Amino acid sequence: MQVTAMDVYRLLPKTNCGKCNEASCMAFATKLIEKEVTLDDCPQLSGDERQKLENLLAPAVKEITFGPEENQVVVGGDEVLYRYELTYYNPTALVVDLPDDLPSEELLNRAQRIMELEFERTGEKLTLDAIALRNRSGSPEKFAEAAEAISKLNFPVVLCTFDVEAMKAALEVLGDQKPLLYAAREDNLGEMAELSVSYGCPLVLFSPGDLEEMKNLSRRLRSLGVTEIVLDPGTFTGEGIGDTIDNFVMIRRLAVEDGDDDFRFPIMGIPALSRLTVSDKIEANIREATVAATLMNRYADILILAGTEIWEIMPVLTLRQGLYTDPRKPQAVDPGVYEFGDVDENSPVILTTNFSLTYYTVEGDLKSGDVTAYLLVLDTEGRAVDVSLAGGQLNGPAVADLIKETGIEERVRDKVMIIPGLAAPASGEIEDDTGWRVLVGPRDSSGIPDYLDKLASE
């Protein structure tokens, strides 16, 4: 059952002291539910009441952190099965494989590429999250050398080996950066648990295709003092992808719907395994990206990839960005006037809405077309042109208010405004309420540069 603000309020001091910077304890309770504040913000909380609140507010899937303190990765924290029920928290961590037997220069170059890979979409920089250092050499010494080399990068690391001695050697040089340890299984459970507790590092539990065994091993790990666990039920690709999806879904259902403490942990998938049966590199990249997208849509909190080609990574990062936006909050930019190029009193004025995807699409088209113009961004509550037109947010009075608030009228000589083609039905109303001449522009912002060239030649 979902926790309400009243459930939280009953356990708060109810003094309305304001030390949390909220007007009342009820307001603080509401923000706790929305995860906008933390229990640490209430100085009067202590003892049993705080513990009760921690238990009450604990998400269905426990949050796990790994990586250096100033560059930590947080995974888990979800409370629902379906995004529309609330939202998803803590985007899937995308981790890239780095074998320890690469020549030292190549090892560092690949690590640097992983760290620096990024692209911008709708104003947000999308990047990879961590390196998976894999003990491909089978040598504890080689594993430790590679761990020491990448420790200087101060970047989150997943240490991948079933060999306890190799894990020990790597932790001696990297343990203070809280790497994620991969992995414990039945034959090394006790030793890996001891390392996890000793170094304070989270531990992956590997039990391929057997959820009953996973449940038993998870319980044993917790009895040994391991509190931060990640579950890997195995990534079977090809004809086995259906079994993989079933296992991921069952684990998350057991956590969210049944509250099964043995499964209330983040899930790891390894799309890199899809490469094992493919010889063609391009086909391998495509298959890996497909598996990554599939598992991300089915509750994967951490994914280990092998490819670093930007054309493979881009769709996975784009899917993650879309999946982890909050459906309760429209994605919007600040309304107002934005300048492109060296504007003056003769520069055209273009109208658009403050829906993020709309704004950044228009921005990209104006920049790529080397357009000099004023861009008026109307507050449509984060809705696109056609949606805001239908919903009544894009209207004459709203545009008139925007003109007044921005002072754009004093910055241009001619009162001429270009509106999106989809906003044509509102052109007359905008003209009447603003007193400006309204021109209906192209339906797609990619046509703006040619449209302006045509206007200038008339």
UniProtKB/Swiss-Prot annotation:
It comes from Methanothermobacter thermautotrophicus (strain ATCC 29096 / DSM 1053 / JCM 10044 / NBRC 100330 / Delta H) (Methanobacterium thermoautotrophicum). Binds 1 [4Fe-4S] cluster. Keywords: 4Fe-4S, Cobalt, Iron, Iron-sulfur, Metal-binding, Methyltransferase, Transferase. Its EC number is 2.1.1.245. It catalyses: 5,6,7,8-tetrahydrosarcinapterin + methyl-Co(III)-[corrinoid Fe-S protein] = 5-methyltetrahydrosarcinapterin + Co(I)-[corrinoid Fe-S protein] + H(+). This is Acetyl-CoA decarbonylase/synthase complex subunit gamma. One of its GO terms (molecular function) is iron ion binding. GO terms for biological process: acetyl-CoA catabolic process; methylation. NCBIfam families: PRK04165.1. The lineage of its organism: Archaea, Methanobacteriati, Methanobacteriota, Methanomada group, Methanobacteria. Part of a complex that catalyzes the reversible cleavage of acetyl-CoA, allowing autotrophic growth from CO(2). Heterodimer of delta and gamma chains. The ACDS complex is made up of alpha, epsilon, beta, gamma and delta chains with a probable stoichiometry of (alpha(2)epsilon(2))(4)-beta(8)-(gamma(1)delta(1))(8). Pfam families: CdhD (PF03599), FeS (PF04060). It comes from the Archaea. InterPro entries: 4Fe-4S_dom, Ac-CoA_synth_d_su_TIM-brl, ACDS_complex_subunit, AcylCoA_decarb/synth_gsu, AcylCoA_decarb/synth_gsu_arc, Dihydropteroate_synth-like_sf. [4Fe-4S] cluster binds at residues 17, 20, 25, 42. Its cofactor is corrinoid; [4Fe-4S] cluster. Residues 1-59 form the 4Fe-4S domain.
